[in-house]
Amino acid sequence: MLQKWKRCCKIESCYIADYVRRNEENKMAIVTTTEMFKKAYEGGYAIGAFNINNMEIIQAITEAAAEEKSPVILQVSAGARKYAKHAYLMALAKAAVEDTGIDLALHLDHGADFEICKACIDGGFSSVMIDGSHYSFEENIEVTKKVVEYAHARGVVVEAELGRLAGVEDDVSVANDDAIYTNPSEVEEFVSKTGVDSLAIAIGTSHGAYKFKGEAKLRFDILDDIAHRLPGFPIVLHGASSVIPELVTEINECGGNLSGAKGVPEELLRKAATMAVCKINIDSDIRLAMTAGIRRVMTAQPDVFDPRTYLTVGREEVKKMVKHKFTAVLGSNGKA
């Protein structure tokens, strides 16, 4: 793969290199999120960042993106790297780019420290998240700045987090009592001192399939305040699966036990996408779609033991769900 440097793009007062890895024919690429976010902010839509764990999920997401002509981010959690290994996921992402002919960003989700971010930067990722939200404000700035300096020198962009989301997902576990809304008065100093390219904030979403006990609410007042303080700056929402009720129902009817599972209503996510939110993370809905498809086959055809049979159905369920997100929630279809 050839490495090419595109023109520098300005995000507020910070310049970053729009780093691109392209094949020799220059037809397809793993790209940064710089141009994606710029267009999304101006266009009033958001980019879906979908967590990947295996070949079928990658195929489903990228085929959906190609068919809907939507920009897309594939993101890898610590759990995914442990399960599938970096080399396999990197190769699968490149294969998906070659097969579908789309551009995509490859992002590290919830990088726990500098070393894991460095490994992903050196290993071909175009974007990384350093999650210093469990540190003090000053320590978060310090570790984020270190990652930013290393990443930008190599053409990779960086996402950071202010505030803490509740919930459990892979290696991320935060009790409800430890969740903290993002303080808008801190964002300008944080972005200025770190040089970070996008910021994940806490406004009421949470990780996992059990996001709300009562009425689902998001603090749009916090989002609006931050948007006014950081005009044009890309904001990220984590824990933004809708925990699609139809999928939960089917899983439960096919022997599952997801009683009380509840996600973020799609209308709230669509509203966020029309504001400053340029990236919306989706993981639980992928797991639910895959599981519903597999359980459907195993329940209706208990004699099936060929993994291709039930994984094909699971893949199609994920693809259908992702296409729905592009068109009805993110508003990103036709924007690639």
Residue ranges and their predicted role:
Residues 8-27:
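Short, Lys/Arg-enriched N-terminal segments with co-localized hydrophobic residues
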Residues 253-258, 264-336:
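C-terminal alpha-helical cap/extension of soluble enzyme domains
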Residues 28-48:
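N-terminal amphipathic alpha-helix/helix-capping segment at the start of soluble metabolic enzymes
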Residues 237-243:
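Long, repeat-rich segments with strong aromatic
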Residues 88, 211-215, 245-252, 273, ...:
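Histidine/acidic-residue-rich catalytic or RNA/ligand-binding cores of hydrolases
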Residues 33-37, 54-75, 79, 88-100, ...:
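Alpha/beta enzyme core
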